[in-house]
Amino acid sequence: MKVTPLMEQYLRIKEQYKDSILLFRLGDFYEAFFEDAKIVSKVLNIVLTRRQDAPMAGIPYHALNSYLKKLVEAGYKVAICDQMEEPSKSKKLIRREVTRVVTPGSILEDEFLSETNNYMAVVSEEKGQYCTIFCDVSTGEVLVHESSDEQETMDLLKNYSISQIVCPDHLKPSLKERFPGVYTESISEWYFSDLEEVEKAYNLKDIHHFELSSLALKTLAALIKYVKYTMITEELNLKPPLLISQRDYMILDSATVENLSLIPGDRGKNLFDVLNNTETPMGARLLKKWILHPLVDRKQIEERLETVEKLVSDRMNLEELRDLLSNVRDVERIVSRVEYNRSVPRDLVALRETLEIIPKLNEILSTFGVFKNLAFPERLLDLLQRAVEDDPAGSPGEGKVIKRGFSPELDEYRDLLEHAEERLKEFEEKERKRTGIQKLKVGYNQVFGYYIEVTKANLDKIPDDYERKQTLVNSERFITPELKEFETKIMAAKERIEELEKELFKNVCEEVKKHKEILLKISEELAKIDVLSTLAYDAILYSYTKPIFSEGRLEIKGGRHPIVERFTQNFVENDIYMDNERRFVVITGPNMSGKSTFIRQVGLISLMAQIGSFVPAQKAILPVFDRIFTRMGARDDLAGGRSTFLVEMNEMALILLKSTEKSLVLLDEVGRGTSTQDGVSIAWAISEELIKRGCKVLFATHFTELTELEKHFPQVQNKTILVKEEGKNVIFTHKVVDGVADRSYGIEVAKIAGIPDRVINRAYEILERNFKNNTKKNGKSNRFSQQIPLFPV
C-alpha cells in the first residue's frame, strides 16, 4: 500500500497513542483506521469501509459526543485528533493534533455525567504504605488517603464508586482482579518522580505547604501528570488536596457502607436517596461525602446541628431559600469546562443565572444569623449580561452567541449579512432595468458563489461587463465587477463574524478564568448551604428531632429506621439505653421479627447525628463514635475464593483489630457459617473480647446460649422482640423488650414464606418428637441444648 502524506500524518500521531483508539478528523468526519476501525465499527454498529486497502470507520463530527460515550462505556481510551487550521486557508496538508484523551475518569461533558462525582483514583504503594488520591476532573476535587492497611484502601475505593483506577505496573493485576468492572490503567514510575509538577500546578514555593507525606506528594505528582496528558494542557483546574484523616472524619469500611445501605448500590433503597432533597448538583455531591465521612469532632457536629436548628425554626425563609437554590446551576463543573477550554455558550448563561441570584440569596441568608454573605463578582456578572445572548444558538462563530451591542464591529458585519438579501433584490431589480431582461435572476451556490442567470433567449441583451461563469442547458450564468465586490464583502463578513465571535467568546471565558477562585468559593458555600437547608427540610418533612451528645450515654426514645419507615406503613418505634456500665446488648428473637432492622437503625441514627442531621426519634442522646462497624448477613466471595464463614471471620478480624472504646459495633448472626458448637464458641469468645475493649455492641443472634453472658458480665443486657401467639398463628410486634426469646418460630416463618402445608405439618411432627426425646434424655426441657437433629437417629 502506497502511503500518502495524510496517512503518514495519521501513522505518526497513532504511534504516540498506541493504547488509544485514535479518532482522526477528516473534514466533517472523525475517522478510525486499521484495528481501531474494526473496534469502532463493532462497538458503534457502523459500517466498516476501506481507504487504500486500510479498514476505515467514520462518525460525523457534530455527533462525536454520543459515539464517544459508547466507546468509553465499552472500556476504551479514545484520543481525539482535530484539524488545527481551516482547510480553506491551507494549501498544504492540514495540521492535526490530539486535543484530548478521553477515559472514564477524565470526562467533562454534562451529557456523559450524572450529578454525582466521577472519581478517578490514583493508587500507589511503597513498603506496605498505600496512598490513594481521588480526583473528580469535572469539579477539580482532590482527596488524599493514606494507610498501611490494604483492606482499608480497598474499602475506600469501593465506597467512592470510582470510574477509573490509575496505578503503577506492579499494582494493576491485583486491582484489576478486585475491581473487574473498573477501567484500570497502569503508568510508568516516572509519573511519580517529578515533584516539580506539584509546585507548578499549585504555584507553590515550598512543596511541603500541603503537609503531605513523600508518598502522597509522589502520587499527587502522578495525578497532575496524568490529567495533563488526558487534557493536553498545562493549565489545570485542581483544588488543593484535602486529606481524609481519621482525626477529622469517621472512616467507614465497605461492609458498613453496604450493610447500612448508606449510598446507592445493589441493595435498592438507601440513606442518601432518603435524605437527598438537595436543590443543586453541588449539594447532592456534598451530601454523599458527608454521609461517607461523618465528623468525629463534637464541636463541628454541634455547629452543623445549630445551623440546621436555625433553619428549621424559620420555615418561611427556609422555603424561600430552597426556591432560590433551585435556580443555581452546577458552578463547579462549569468552571472546570471553562478552565479546560471545553465550555459551551450555555455554560456562561448558566453561570450568569447563578450569579444573578446571589444578592437575593444574601438577603435571605442574613435572616438566619448563621451564614456569611456570599461573594458577589459584580463586574463578571455585568460582562456576562452584556456579552452573551440569553438563549444562544449554535456554537461560537455562527453569529448567534454574542449579544448585539457588545461589539460594534461584529454588529456591522452582522448587519451586512442580514441586509444581504435585500441588497441582492435591489441589485437584481437594477440589472433588469439596465438590461431590459425581465426574467434575469440573481442567485448563489456553494461552488460558483453569486451569479446572474440569463435565459438563452435573452443572451443578445447582456452588457459587455457581464463575465460568463457557467453554461447550462437553457441558460447561462454571469458575474459583474459589482456583484464580485458584493460577494467578496459577504464572504469576508462571514469569515470575520466567525473569527470575531470566537475571539469574543474566548475573551469572556478568559475573564471567567480570572474569577476561578471566587467562583469555586461561591460553589463550595452554595453546596454547604444547600446540604444544611436540605437537612432542615428533611427534619420537618420526616419529623426528625435534634440529637444531643454526651460522653458515654446512648439513649434513643421512639427510634425509627430512616429508610424502612419511608416504605413501610405503621413503623414500630423502639427504645434503647446503653452507657459505659451497660454497653453490650444481646438481642434474640425469630427471623422476620425485626432484630436486624433494630440494630441497623441504631447505627443509622448515630451516623446521621454525626453528619449534622436531625434523627428519626422522639429523643436521642448519643456519644460521638470514632467508628461504626458492622458484621451482618451471609455472603461469600467466590471471585476471591472465600467462603461465607471466611468472609465473616475476615470482617470480625477487622473489627477486633480496629475497634476502640469509642466505637459502635453492630453484629448480626456471627458464627452461623460453621457448626453450632464452633459458632457458639467463637461468638462467645468474640463477645468477651468486645466487652473487655469497652465499645458499645448490639449483637443480634439466634444463639440463645449467648444470653448467658448477662450472668457473667454486668455490662451485658438481654433484649428480645415481642412475639404474640394466637392459636397456630404468630404476630411479630417488632417491639424490643427486655428478656430472652424462648422460641425461634422458624416453622411459622417458613409458613409465612409459603412453604407447602404438608412440609409445615411434617416439620411440626419432627419438632415435637425431638422435643420429647430431648426432654426424656435430659429430664427437662433445655433451651440451651445443641441443635436438634432433623431426623431420628
UniProtKB/Swiss-Prot annotation:
Pfam families: MutS_I, MutS_II, MutS_III, MutS_IV, MutS_V
Gene Ontology MF: a single term: ATP-dependent DNA damage sensor activity
Binding sites annotated in the UniProt record for ATP: G589, P590, N591, M592, S593, G594, K595, S596
Keyword Ribonucleoprotein among UniProt keywords: no
Keyword Nucleotide-binding applies: yes
InterPro entries in UniProt: DNA_mismatch_repair_MutS, DNA_mismatch_repair_MutS-lik_N, DNA_mismatch_repair_MutS/MSH, DNA_mismatch_repair_MutS_C, DNA_mismatch_repair_MutS_clamp, DNA_mismatch_repair_MutS_core, DNA_mismatch_repair_MutS_N, DNA_mismatch_repair_MutS_sf
Cellular component terms per the entry's GO annotation: cytosol
Gene Ontology biological process terms in this record: mismatch repair
N-terminal signal peptide: none
UniProt entry keywords in alphabetical sequence: ATP-binding, DNA damage, DNA repair, DNA-binding, Nucleotide-binding
Gene3D superfamilies assigned to the protein according to its UniProt record, in alphabetical order: 1.10.1420.10, DNA repair protein MutS, domain I, MutS, connector domain, P-loop containing nucleotide triphosphate hydrolases
Domain of life of the organism encoding this protein: Bacteria
HAMAP family in the record: MutS
Family statement drawn from the similarity comment of this UniProt entry: Belongs to the DNA mismatch repair MutS family.
Cited function: This protein is involved in the repair of mismatches in DNA. It is possible that it carries out the mismatch recognition step. This protein has a weak ATPase activity.
Identification of the protein by name: DNA mismatch repair protein MutS
Species of provenance: Thermotoga petrophila (strain ATCC BAA-488 / DSM 13995 / JCM 10881 / RKU-1)
Gene name for this UniProt entry: mutS
